[in-house]
């Protein structure tokens, strides 16, 4: 079995190590979230994936976004396909790097966070932890399969790319489906400031 994704990694010398998967945002690349890999648990294998769609040099997307006038839309079918592909290829990384299949965490930012929610809700409890930064739940990517994933959500109250209200709507969806989560807001735009970074790292170290 091989993977179709380009990725960079930081591997653990420990057998049966936890696996942390990093999913970057729209227009970014695999180097973005990997920049704080040194802050993540030392015994974990860390895989940072590059999204498959090239927008321009060093800029990639998991699925296309387009506008109809002022209305933002996205390629629903493309998003569902990449979600399923990521779920299917989890086993490749587990086997190649001798990881613990019961200790998989996803850290996603923006479009990567949206995908992370979709993966968690469609993967039959494959994911132990999800850190969803500056994203939201997209209903068309949900299957609402039963799972026990721990979820951390954060959003900047001044986010100009994905409005803060998207996370409020996400919380309502999760509440309506009796899904537990931790939600924190920060005085920031579309990004992760030091307070946000410390917050999700503290949470992840307790959970992973």
Segment roles from a protein language model:
Residues 160-166:
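Conserved alpha/beta-hydrolase "acid-adjacent" motif
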Residues 125-137:
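A conserved short beta-strand
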Residues 152-155, 159:
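Short beta-strand/loop motif that positions the catalytic acidic residue
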Residues 106-108, 133, 154:
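Short beta-strand immediately N-terminal to the catalytic nucleophile in serine-hydrolase-like folds
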Residues 152, 168-208:
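C-terminal catalytic histidine-bearing segment of alpha/beta-hydrolase fold enzymes
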Residues 108-112, 116:
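Gly/Ala-rich beta-loop-alpha elbow adjacent to hydrolase catalytic centers
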């Amino acid at each position: 079995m091989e993977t179709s994704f380009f990725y960079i990694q930081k591997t653990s010398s420990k057998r049966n190590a936890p696996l942390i998967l990093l999913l970057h945002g729209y227009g970014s690349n695999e180097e973005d979230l990997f920049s704080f890999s040194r802050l993540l648990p030392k015994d974990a294998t860390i895989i940072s994936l590059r999204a498959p769609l090239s927008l321009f040099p060093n800029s990639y997307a998991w699925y296309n976004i387009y506008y109809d006038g002022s209305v933002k839309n996205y390629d629903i079918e493309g998003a569902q396909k990449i979600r399923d592909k990521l779920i299917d290829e989890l086993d490749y990384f587990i086997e190649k790097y001798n990881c613990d299949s019961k200790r998989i965490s996803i850290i996603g930012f923006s479009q990567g966070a949206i995908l992370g929610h979709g993966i968690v809700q469609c993967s039959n409890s494959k994911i132990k932890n999800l850190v969803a930064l500056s994203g939201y739940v997209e209903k068309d990517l949900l299957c609402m399969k039963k799972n026990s994933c721990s979820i951390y959500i954060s959003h900047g109250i001044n986010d100009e790319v994905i409005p803060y209200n998207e996370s409020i709507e996400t919380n309502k969806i999760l509440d309506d489906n009796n899904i537990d989560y931790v939600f924190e807001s920060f005085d920031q735009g579309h990004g992760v400031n030091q307070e946000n970074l410390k917050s999700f790292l503290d949470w992840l170290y307790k959970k992973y």
